């Protein structure tokens, strides 16, 4: 009996340690009122993204839910309007696997929204599922799509400075090892998926690092945020069906709820005084050191150039006229590199009308062009 009690006590003690070190998340403070500000949150129809959007809506922000599924995105926007009491929550279609969809979203957003104060890259995948593409789907969704979207929306972020870009990464970046000779090769099998996921999270951290360098002095700051171990759809979605009922109770005990996972991204989006820490990696609402591979500035620059090519950005744009304003290409052009053709981008929910010319002033004295993508 004594041994049984001792074992129970040890288990309880171990759980308390796990709870306070992993499960319990610090609460985000930051700016109290966000009235008059606009925030885009990708992948905001569930999990961490939805909880992030809810907190932003409660603080009065105009929140754009950028999601792939129209049905789930519109349902989430309705739920958030009801729960927050804020009618300024809308849905816009965005499929990060499709470069054409990213361009369409940017065009629709820039033509309808006069402000962009915070861009939160929350959407991501951990597995290719049953999809078999001719490119690295994990890198496309988790890094290349967000990279392109950031470039297309940077002029609006700059015009609304001080503004922020938050990239939701992961501690999995520590396992990442980028192979630039095979950066966009297809991913096959669960072992390749594990590596590709870690590589994409490393790419997130390197992107934040290089973006901070590119944006220095513009008033736009950026941060990589690790939400912690979270009991979200990203964790459960790709598990075998028979395993989910077994792991759900365990996940509830040892993983954070999505609300807890939203705290560090919210901290990076809202906390005042962290501007000098632009480009850094945050976990549990404070700066944390990254792996040696994530501190490699040469790798960050090389990834930047490689991603521009993968995103369809003109390789010679550095030599273009710096006074010429960038414009997204016609989003109706099909993409040979994309997943299935994106649906037409629409806005669901209350929206502003935007009169006058769009502010597309150049960010870094370099013109960004988007190539026409060839018809398959």
From Swiss-Prot:
Which coarse location class describes where this protein primarily resides? secreted
Q: Which GO terms describe its cellular component?
A: extracellular region
Compositionally biased residues, Polar residues: 343-367
Query: Its domain of life?
Result: Eukaryota
UniProt-annotated catalytic positions: 197
Annotated residues that bind NAD(+) are located at: 46, 48, 197, 201, 232
Cellular localization per UniProt = Secreted
Q: Which CDD domains match?
A: retinol-DH_like_SDR_c_like
Question: Looking at the record, which segments are called Disordered?
Answer: 311-376
Q: Where is the composition biased (Acidic residues)?
A: 316-328
Q: Where does the record locate the signal sequence feature?
A: 1-25
Molecular function per GO:
oxidoreductase activity
Top class in the EC scheme: oxidoreductase
Keywords linked to the UniProt accession: NAD, NADP, Oxidoreductase, Secreted, Signal
Q: Which residues bind substrate?
A: 170
Compositionally biased intervals (Low complexity): 333-342
Q: What is its EC number?
A: 1.1.-.-
The family line of this record is:
Belongs to the short-chain dehydrogenases/reductases (SDR) family.
Q: What does this protein do?
A: Putative oxidoreductase.
Could you identify this protein by its name? Dehydrogenase/reductase SDR family member 13
**Organism classification, top ranks?**
Eukaryota, Metazoa, Chordata, Craniata, Vertebrata
